[in-house]
Amino acid sequence: MNLDNAKCFKQRVFIGNLTSEHLNKTVTIAGWVKRIKKLGELNFVIVGDKTNTIQVTCKNKEQVKYLTREDLVIVKGKLKRLDSVRFEITNPTITLFAKSKTPPLIIEDKTDALEEVRLRYRYLDLRRPVMQKRLALRHKVTLAVRNWLDQMGFIEVETPTLTKSTPEGARDFLVPARIREHSFYALPQSPQIYKQLLMVGGTEKYFQIAHVYRDEDSRKDRQPEHTQIDLEVAFYTKEMVMDLIQRLFVDVFRQVLNIKLKKPFPVLKFAEAFNRFGSDKPDLRYGFELEDCTDLFQDSPNQFTNLINAGGIVGGIQLPNLYLDEVSFKALRKLAKDNGVSLEFYSDKASSLKQPLDLPLAGTILLVAHKSKTQAWTALGAIRNELKYHLNLVKPNQYSFCWIVDFPLYEFDEKEQKWVSAHNMFSNPQPQWLVNFENHKAEALSEQYDLVLNGFELGSGSIRIHDPEVQTRLMQSLGVDPQQFGFVMEAYQYGAPVHAGMGLGLDRLMMIINNVDNIREVMAFPKNAQGIEMHTNAPDQVDIKDITTIWSKHPVK
């Protein structure tokens, strides 16, 4: 590095940090050329860094003669007022620091680039001011969480990322281990086991901003690699954990976003949430609760008669004084079909029913019917969730938290035709079910609690099992050999405290805060919808030599 560069770097000011104190003084900035405009003898160069953009007004055309978009420049000149709000730099010396090829996308807040192009050239996409703001906001939220938990007496502990593959949950990402023949590490789906062992070890208050890995299909709110705010505490009840998490979010939202959250967060039982909203993660920013409309079709022959006579149910959502256009109804009908039901509607203007309905309110009623209430209510819940986009029911910066409790301990897997753990097999049964939970799988409840924000599950937690006898019974009831978790069972025999915890999705939280529709928008280098990292093309094939030498002394047969 030459001395001139070193001097410039020390003098450099971020564009966003320029204030009236710099007026009429010589300032130095560094950034990328965004646009070049010519007006008579004047040349206007718009230069931007991660904080803002500024106009550089130049009379010397030789200085801008060879500049193009995204060239990296260092500008030194006088700071002047452009108007009552903005500044400009005049009489500049412009130094070309690094030449840029023609960029494959428009590097502005609004870009017409397809997502695949943005991900392929993510380093360019990250220059967009909106992306830099998202990264900065993520940093502030993470820092606020760390500081708050530190004040509450938590310590941050890093747990292993090369660990043991265990049953339950999604598929593991496996890593071959050279040190032991035909053996694999697994990347953790959660720090679950280690944080429980930390409680046995006397840590009492643990947290970690943890990277976790799940080999599952990507969705708008899922990635194979993501980050969670993970914590665990000893000698806490469910209510104490819920109060702790509520206070954490109230403080973080106040400090980072200057938003005062309503408290206490509403608490809904799992069954209540499903009956009212058709979901265990309801969006409480608007109403439109689900209703049993079977009685409306009891007295006269109609298209639901046979189903009702066979014990089926008709469910509905009333939209007082609201009407859906054809495009919206078509989209909702497809959503219903994807959920295994048909969607009908009736309003005082139009109807897909074969007979009129006597409704007390003007507006629209959406209807589905099915022999199974679970199927009908699940479909209606999905429709209700989609309505907010078609009817503009919510406003930006509107946040509605709620807790869901009294979850089932088990759920029946229709595909596998067996009972599985509804959350994870370390969740404690509620006290009234401790004696015989394995004999009442359809009724037994767990001490699980989920935090929901704006219709997304933000995090899930529970009181953990700390009694080795209860843990053995639960595992055996799921067909899991307790010896697969012998290291946990052994630890429980050395005075394990009552403990509880939670994992909160940081990426999902930032998606909601930034009001974007998928978590790829708030991650620096996400995978695409197919799980591919576009710039490096990972996952990729490796040299066969690298594979064969892993177990060279013990080749795979």
UniProtKB/Swiss-Prot annotation:
Alphabetical UniProt keywords: Aminoacyl-tRNA synthetase, ATP-binding, Cytoplasm, Ligase, Nucleotide-binding, Protein biosynthesis
Primary location: cytoplasm
Cited Pfam families: tRNA-synt_2, tRNA_anti-codon
Keyword Nucleotidyltransferase applies: no
Catalytic activity as recorded in UniProt: tRNA(Asp) + L-aspartate + ATP = L-aspartyl-tRNA(Asp) + AMP + diphosphate
Signal peptide per UniProt: none
EC top class, as a word: ligase
Subcellular location as annotated: Cytoplasm
Residues that hold ATP according to the record: 214-216, 223, 457, 505-508
Location of region: Aspartate: 192-195
GO-annotated cellular components: cytoplasm
Enzyme Commission number(s) of this protein: 6.1.1.12
Gene Ontology molecular function: any one: nucleic acid binding
List of residues binding L-aspartate: 168, 214, 423, 464
Protein family according to the UniProt entry: Belongs to the class-II aminoacyl-tRNA synthetase family. Type 1 subfamily.
HAMAP family: Asp_tRNA_synth_type1 (MF_00044)
Subunit relationships: Homodimer.
Protein known as: Aspartate--tRNA ligase
Source organism: Mycoplasma pneumoniae (strain ATCC 29342 / M129 / Subtype 1)
